[in-house]
């Protein structure tokens, strides 16, 4: 049996840009992507801490070191500049894989810089 498990989480990142007229997606600083082992075009689930909205989209690479968290297209309607988001990826895993796996959680500072990397 496969279970859908948390793979990685960017915890309480701050929205820095929203562009309703862009094609879609979420731009994420390359440093955050590397730390969380998230890949461009990977599906993500986003949870808005400020208003409770929950939605999904896909990743595009943001400029390294920029602190960018940009919501594009329809996703731009789900959050405002300055809102805090939790961004997660999930993966199907067998019970054997789960026994040895630990998800990554990236904690950030007020500028979306990496503050701490946790493995649970």
From Swiss-Prot:
Is synthesized initially as an inactive proenzyme, which is activated by self-cleavage at a specific serine bond to produce a beta-subunit with a hydroxyl group at its C-terminus and an alpha-subunit with a pyruvoyl group at its N-terminus. This is Aspartate 1-decarboxylase. The active site is at residues 25, 58. It catalyses: L-aspartate + H(+) = beta-alanine + CO2. Substrate binds at residues 57, 73-75. It holds the Pfam family Asp_decarbox. It comes from Cupriavidus necator (strain ATCC 17699 / DSM 428 / KCTC 22496 / NCIMB 10442 / H16 / Stanier 337). Gene3D superfamilies: 2.40.40.20. GO terms for molecular function: aspartate 1-decarboxylase activity. The gene is panD. CDD domains: Asp_decarbox. Keywords: Autocatalytic cleavage, Cytoplasm, Decarboxylase, Lyase, Pantothenate biosynthesis, Pyruvate, Schiff base, Zymogen.
